[in-house]
């Protein structure tokens, strides 16, 4: 974990980064990634994955490891640095890398610059060093996971720090301006100052002390506790103003041990000013002095703030009438005012009541029409208007009865063509009977079937009302419905049982998967067997040379 050597970064090709990314993707669920899996993930256009792997191992961007059961590659910190720097350079954030400014137990800090020559600070998180091995017990980065890579934990730490820095910078806290981040690298503003631990003289230590204590209280009022607020994470500029850095260990004020973390931060500042500047003050904040102003811990999901606490907060602090009004105003573009809604409700209710009253009157039940509210108030109407209204209602009832009669007659309209054909056939049969000497209207047939003769006469009487012209007019009032018999569809049935079809499809898919795995293994493991064969030949050759040397 030495300094980042970026000299080889400019000479790396696209295939090199493709293979390096394949190793990173394989390490999501592998501690040691097999070469066959790397070859299948990289899928180089012209092949040669193992040659690229050997070059990356030579430059210590990946490491070759071999155990009793598996053999493969793993990504190193240098390779992870190269991937992050490549992405930042493609975004035109980082163009050049300078000297190393500082080394800590969790990170390394470098000076970088963009194309315009503007300098920034690059922080590379290095979790898992010898002096910081209890991170999995002290931090909740891994959450419910049991086995997590240190590289992945470094990435989570960088994501948390960038989220904290962005939220604090937007709320005017004295923190560096966040620029960008990728994987475990965070690019931020370069502060022109010195850490407080390197300063031995201050003109006014009381003002610096007060500013530090106010910053602790301001953080707590926003729902956060720094957790590591000491002289190593505070930068003092030329005007003796404090800038706060290093945020991954921040916790929420809802944490069970929040008061202990708060008192520890206060004690660190008190002890430092007493030792370094011989300044002691009786005024210092306590955890009871916190007045909650913001929910920054909810926004950035700080440690100690769980989903259960969020649900409890929603129950304890429900939305008030002001919040509901704001939501209704911002709801949609098609919202109506209260007056418009009331008018529309009155019109809709009056229309429904008038329709209901008309239907009751058509059925024989007299009910007074309840029109608009203005019509209800006008009870003293003249006799002429009452007669006109009753005349209109009688006309309306007559129209309803005519429509009902047409609907009853329309029930037989659908069979008009069939009955027409039947009547024509009956007429032909009657003509044949008359030609055969049997009169159509003879007394014998009248005595045998008198009701049939009556029906035929009735049909002839109503026939003028069932011609083609009237049928077209009556079809306008028909309600078109789908016939059950006509809408039925025949379902095609297969002679092969469905169980047999499922078995065949499953067998075919299994065969395809096995063939794909076989091709991948053959493609990736061929060179591994070649390497083993070369090692065996080398051992045999060396043993033969030793035997010839001793004269055996």
Curated annotation (Swiss-Prot):
Keyword terms, alphabetized: ATP-binding, Cell cycle, Cytoplasm, Kinase, Magnesium, Metal-binding, Nucleotide-binding, Phosphoprotein, Ribosome biogenesis, Serine/threonine-protein kinase, Transferase
Catalyzed reactions per annotation: L-seryl-[protein] + ATP = O-phospho-L-seryl-[protein] + ADP + H(+); L-threonyl-[protein] + ATP = O-phospho-L-threonyl-[protein] + ADP + H(+)
SUPFAM superfamilies xrefs: Protein kinase-like (PK-like) (SSF56112), Winged helix' DNA-binding domain (SSF46785)
Binding site for ATP: 123
PTM-bearing positions, type Phosphoserine: 332, 335, 337, 350, 362, 380, 382, 385, 390, 412, 417, 442, 548
CC terms in the record's Gene Ontology section: cytoplasm; cytosol; nucleoplasm; nucleus; preribosome, small subunit precursor
PTM entry text: Autophosphorylated (in vitro). Phosphorylation at Ser-335, Ser-380, Ser-548 by PLK1 affects the timing of the metaphase-anaphase transition.
GO molecular function: ATP binding; metal ion binding; protein kinase activity; protein serine kinase activity; protein serine/threonine kinase activity
Motif (Nuclear export signal): 399-408
Outcome of swapping residue 216 to T: In a renal clear cell carcinoma sample; somatic mutation
Keyword set includes Cell cycle: yes
Subcellular location: Cytoplasm
GO annotation, biological process: maturation of SSU-rRNA; positive regulation of ribosomal small subunit export from nucleus; positive regulation of rRNA processing; protein autophosphorylation; regulation of mitotic metaphase/anaphase transition; ribosomal small subunit biogenesis
Modified residues (Phosphotyrosine): 445
Cofactor field: Mg(2+)
Catalytic machinery residues: 228
Protein kinase domain ranges (all copies): 97-272
EC numbers, comma separated: 2.7.11.1
Assembly behavior: Associated with late 40S pre-ribosomal particles. Interacts with PLK1 (via its N-terminus).
Family listed: Belongs to the protein kinase superfamily. RIO-type Ser/Thr kinase family.
Purpose: Serine/threonine-protein kinase involved in the final steps of cytoplasmic maturation of the 40S ribosomal subunit. Involved in export of the 40S pre-ribosome particles (pre-40S) from the nucleus to the cytoplasm. Its kinase activity is required for the release of NOB1, PNO1 and LTV1 from the late pre-40S and the processing of 18S-E pre-rRNA to the mature 18S rRNA. Regulates the timing of the metaphase-anaphase transition during mitotic progression, and its phosphorylation, most likely by PLK1, regulates this function.
Protein name stated in the entry: Serine/threonine-protein kinase RIO2
Taxonomic path: Eukaryota, Metazoa, Chordata, Craniata, Vertebrata
Gene: RIOK2
């Amino acid at each position: 974990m030495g300094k980042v050597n970026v000299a080889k970064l400019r000479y790396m090709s696209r295939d090199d980064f493709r293979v390096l990314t394949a190793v990173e993707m394989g390490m999501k669920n592998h501690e040691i990634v097999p070469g066959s899996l790397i070859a299948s993930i990289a899928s180089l256009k012209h092949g040669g994955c193992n040659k690229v792997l050997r070059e990356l191992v030579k430059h210590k961007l990946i490491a070759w490891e071999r155990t009793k059961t598996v053999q493969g590659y793993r990504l190193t910190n240098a390779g992870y640095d190269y991937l992050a720097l490549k992405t930042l350079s493609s975004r035109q954030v980082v163009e050049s890398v300078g000297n190393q400014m500082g080394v800590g137990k969790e990170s390394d800090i470098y000076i970088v610059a963009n194309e315009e020559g503007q300098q920034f600070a690059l922080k590379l998180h290095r979790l898992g060093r010898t002096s910081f091995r209890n991170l999995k017990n002290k931090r909740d980065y891994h959450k419910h996971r049991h086995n997590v890579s240190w590289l992945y934990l470094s990435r989570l730490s960088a994501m948390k720090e960038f989220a904290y820095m962005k939220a604090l910078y937007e709320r005017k806290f004295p923190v560096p301006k966040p620029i960008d981040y990728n994987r475990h690298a965070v690019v931020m503003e370069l502060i022109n100052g010195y850490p407080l631990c390197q300063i031995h003289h201050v003109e006014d230590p009381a003002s610096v002390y007060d500013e530090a204590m106010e910053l602790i209280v301001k953080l707590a009022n926003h729902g956060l506790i720094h957790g590591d607020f000491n002289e190593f994470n505070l930068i003092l500029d030329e005007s003796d103003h404090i800038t706060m850095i290093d945020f991954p260990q921040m916790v929420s004020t809802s944490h069970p041990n929040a008061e202990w973390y708060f008192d520890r931060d206060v004690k660190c500042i008190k002890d430092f000013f007493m030792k370094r500047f011989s300044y002691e003050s009786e005024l210092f904040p306590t955890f009871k002095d916190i007045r909650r102003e913001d929910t920054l811990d909810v926004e950035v999901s700080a440690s100690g703030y769980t989903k259960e606490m969020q649900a409890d907060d929603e129950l304890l602090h429900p939305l008030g009438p002001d919040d509901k009004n704001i939501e209704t105003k911002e709801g949609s573009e098609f919202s109506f005012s209260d007056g418009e809604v009331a008018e529309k409700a009155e019109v809709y209710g009056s229309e429904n009541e008038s329709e209901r009253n008309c239907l009751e009157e058509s059925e024989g039940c007299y009910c007074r029409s309840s029109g608009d509210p203005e019509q209800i108030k006008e009870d003293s109407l003249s006799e002429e208007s009452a007669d006109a209204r009753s005349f209109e209602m009688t006309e309306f009832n007559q129209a309803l009865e005519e429509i009902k009669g047409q609907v009853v007659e329309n029930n037989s309209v659908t069979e008009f063509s069939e009955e027409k054909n039947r009547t024509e056939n009956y007429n032909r049969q009657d003509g044949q009977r008359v030609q055969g000497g049997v009169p159509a209207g003879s007394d014998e047939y009248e005595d045998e079937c008198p009701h049939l003769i009556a029906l035929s006469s009735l049909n002839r009487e109503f026939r003028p009302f069932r011609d083609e012209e009237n049928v077209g007019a009556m079809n306008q009032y028909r309600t078109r419905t789908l016939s059950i018999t006509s809408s039925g569809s025949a379902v095609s049935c297969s002679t092969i049982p469905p169980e047999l079809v499922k078995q065949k499809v499953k067998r075919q898919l299994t065969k395809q998967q096995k063939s794909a795995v076989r091709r991948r293994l053959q493609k990736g493991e061929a060179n591994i067997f070649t390497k083993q064969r070369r090692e065996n030949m080398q051992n045999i050759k060396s043993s033969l040379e030793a035997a010839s040397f001793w004269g055996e």
